[in-house]
Swiss-Prot record:
GO MF term set: membrane insertase activity
Role description: Part of the endoplasmic reticulum membrane protein complex (EMC) that enables the energy-independent insertion into endoplasmic reticulum membranes of newly synthesized membrane proteins. Preferentially accommodates proteins with transmembrane domains that are weakly hydrophobic or contain destabilizing features such as charged and aromatic residues. Involved in the cotranslational insertion of multi-pass membrane proteins in which stop-transfer membrane-anchor sequences become ER membrane spanning helices.
Subunit (UniProt): Component of the ER membrane protein complex (EMC).
A Gene Ontology biological process term: tail-anchored membrane protein insertion into ER membrane
Organism: Rattus norvegicus (Rat)
SMART domains: DUF106
Homology family: Belongs to the EMC3 family.
Protein name: ER membrane protein complex subunit 3
Record topology, Cytoplasmic segments: 39-114, 188-261
Membrane topology listed for this record: Multi-pass membrane protein
Amino acid sequence: MAGPELLLDSNIRLWVVLPIVIITFFVGMIRHYVSILLQSDKKLTQEQVSDSQVLIRSRVLRENGKYIPKQSFLTRKYYFNNPEDGFFKKTKRKVVPPSPMTDPTMLTDMMKGNVTNVLPMILIGGWINMTFSGFVTTKVPFPLTLRFKPMLQQGIELLTLDASWVSSASWYFLNVFGLRSIYSLILGQDNAADQSRMMQEQMTGAAMAMPADTNKAFKTEWEALELTDHQWALDDVEEELMARDLHFEGMFKKELQTSIF
């Protein structure tokens, strides 16, 4: 037989639940704009810009080569894929993996990420845990097992309390992960307010990801262009155009009436 239902004071909703939601939301908004202010522009070399433009030209040739004559297509393809001195064959780039110990820019970016992501979470989480400790804020609308008690009832040591109830400290962490859709709606998909995404990137090492290997990109594009054949898309376009009923008489009458009035 189930025990009596726990009745919460309505002041908890006004002075605990809503303040935690509002504080978490505005901290995320401030983090987004602070990250924009601290964001450093990544400097690209002339070689990187040139390589990216070459890859774009090759991709455009594969996609739209059917709209140029076959000789023009083969000439451009020969420039990229010539087995002897083609661009993708003769061009070799030296890829140097970045090292945080030798690159001050990476160290600065890591420090900025810690300042805008880790430090606010520690400070705000500690302040909320100290200010609103010991409160039961809400209850999830479905039953949970006892394994969820350490996650949803931080700061409350009640063995008899149902695992569906959420403490104030756990309510803060639920808001950190639950406001992602609100941030995406207000700030756009790629925003710095989503603290959970920042944490995942730091844990998976996405923030220190290796740069793309230009040589592999050239090889992939060479293979894709090598498999592309020219298929003339404008074959018999003159006959098709002449066979259509273009209704020139109606167009001329409309222009004549417009000029009269």
